[in-house]
Amino acid sequence: MSQQGESSDPKSGKKDFSTAILERKKSPNRLVVDEAVNDDNSVVTMHPQTMEKLQLFRGDTILIKGKKRKDTICIALADENCEEPKIRMNKVVRSNLRVRLGDVVSVHQCPDVKYGKRVHILPIDDTIEGVTGNLFDAFLKPYFLEAYRPVRKGDLFLVRGGMRSVEFKVVETDPGEYCVVAPDTEIFCEGEPLKREDEERLDEVGYDDVGGVRKQMAQIRELVELPLRHPQLFKSIGVKPPKGILLYGPPGSGKTLIARAVANETGAFFFCINGPEIMSKLAGESESNLRKAFEEAEKNAPSIIFIDEIDSIAPKREKTHGEVERRIVSQLLTLMDGLKSRAHVIVIGATNRPNSIDPALRRFGRFDREIDIGVPDEVGRLEVLRIHTKNMKLSDDVDLERIAKDTHGYVGADLAALCTEAALQCIREKMDVIDLEDETIDAEVLNSMAVTNEHFQTALGTSNPSALRETVVEVPNVSWEDIGGLENVKRELQETVQYPVEHPEKFEKFGMSPSKGVLFYGPPGCGKTLLAKAIANECQANFISVKGPELLTMWFGESEANVREIFDKARQSAPCVLFFDELDSIATQRGSSVGDAGGAADRVLNQLLTEMDGMSAKKTVFIIGATNRPDIIDPALLRPGRLDQLIYIPLPDEDSRHQIFKACLRKSPIAKNVDLRALARHTQGFSGADITEICQRACKYAIRENIEKDIERERKSRENPEAMDEDTVDDEVAEIKAAHFEESMKFARRSVSDADIRKYQAFAQTLQQSRGFGSEFRFPESGDRTTTGSDPFAASAGGADEDDLYS
């Protein structure tokens, strides 16, 4: 069971202690839950040796402790067939303990269980629909007669009788928490049937329900459980236990859930303060609310105070203008670490803006530990998906690992939304057999429902990570087939963007980080933006499109902040492709922009430079820029490490033009006599956009002709209805004919002049020259000792016979 911790880091001989608290302790009274053979609600069976180890005898009453601080009491019997560290119990006992098969429970002796004087037992309302007759005679009497069953207050148990099985709940027992129902015990079953409380109620979140934060969970448990359960540990070493934890991370990553789980599993008193609620209009009222909360918690120690959205009540004091906020911050500071020490009270704060909290709160003694609950990685996402789908009916073809791979940048909440969406998709398919008017739905319809892989794929298409909600880009459905020509450009792009996402281990093996930037340049209308769309669609990364000019705002310092935010978002939902269209609007050469908004463009460019290759670590964020004025872009952007791959996208040649015609007309019906090759030959110097325009225009003519024919036919049929019947036969197929293309070619025009093309080619050539510097370089042969001739500058240094200054 504790294998995970030891093998967590095989390379170093040292054991990783950071998650030590999560490991199961070995002790003889911890047993693994197994399915029962005989179905009795009050009996659990163990191997005789296990019984001997625990000093139990056949028929002893034992107390079993399960998850979420639930326990129940049962009678222990020996069973030779049960394996050693296992305990067999049926479904009723398991649900009372909130455990599943394979979980671990602890068994304790429970010697002095009294015979009960009276017990109060009520049925659960949804199991007794249509049951007639006296419940007591039919169900309870045969169940308890001569059986001496132990019961625990709050337990549910299932009784089979006649044709039905009914669930009952033990509402009250006298004496105390548990007792044995003997023949002289009075059983009350008067009263309204109980409503079933949801077994998985929200306030019953356990550690099992939090996935993807294993390391953080371990840290939180050391900080919370150790001081609350064993304060003497810290006393014996002589340090004060930590008292505050600040959880921060993007919204939806499970901060509040973790706090709930901790409170439930430790059994501490849980006091929740929602930031904005303690504000009040009366002076001094808000502070006293805070004081009351802390006093309440100290009365009920050990306790946990959870302050959600702490940035709303403890902002930086310099920045706030209101007097009230400052007083509240001061009050919080003194409460958390004032002269009066607080014992056994742990404060957990949660926020997604840790930098807007007053810095005095973030020192040791107040919030000692700051735990970053980030976006989960692939393993974490798989855990979260398993948790959300554990109660769903999944068909066999659902591949959760695959889904976890495809959901880059999703946090827990997004994965929950994904599962819900998949289930809804499943329900929508069955809507034709579900009638909303009916009272009940057929059982076979309900049983036939299962969520398939297809439903998940549909849901994946409609959902996106919440970090990207405001910069959301509908991932365009452009694939590589839509792009005619440009074969080698496509290949380079795939290598730049798809390899690092799909084969990260290769890069690690060769010890290099992949290049992160590409700049497309070339005449307008050649498919630069289209390429970026295709790569966003083909590679499973998230895609943020940034239009250059919209980053600039009128406020000072705001434009740079926009750049920073975009990069932050991209990092949160990595791997991510950032596409800057019209890059020249924000990346002009510095110093050239005189007088525009106090040089805002220059500052934006500086921010861009530092974000792309500054001190902060880049995760897998790819930057693709597109521009048709490469000559005015600041050279600092074009150095390797920022936009290191400069790809010139030229006007298409004849083959590419043929491909573009094909790609444009993929879905259109074309007459047999249209020769696309001839069209491609005649459109020398046209860009991709011009070619698309030719196709659109030809389409327009075809549609016009078609509509005119329809009108003509209707008129004829009105004039003489008899002739209509023969006429419908020779209705020709609607298609784009050669005549339409000829008509369309009359209006065709080139959007890029020759002078422009020459400019682009000159720029491309200068880049080629600066690039091809070491084309003569060869490694010297191993036998060849003389390497003097390999220096290209030595020959041009004007003969070596002159005295060289530097020799």
UniProtKB/Swiss-Prot annotation:
Biased composition (Basic and acidic residues): 8-21
Gene Ontology MF annotations: ATP binding; ATP hydrolysis activity; polyubiquitin modification-dependent protein binding
Localization, UniProt: Cell membrane
Binding residues annotated for ATP, in chain numbering: 249-256, 522-529
One record GO biological process: proteasome-mediated ubiquitin-dependent protein catabolic process
UniProt topology in membrane: Peripheral membrane protein
A GO term from the CC aspect: VCP-NPL4-UFD1 AAA ATPase complex
Location of the region described as Disordered in the Swiss-Prot/TrEMBL record: 1-21, 771-807
A Pfam family of this chain: CDC48_2
Keywords in alphabetical order: ATP-binding, Cell cycle, Cell membrane, Membrane, Nucleotide-binding, Repeat
PANTHER family the record matches: AAA-FAMILY ATPASE, CELL DIVISION CYCLE PROTEIN 48 HOMOLOG
Family, similarity comment: Belongs to the AAA ATPase family.
Protein name per its UniProtKB record: Cell division cycle protein 48 homolog
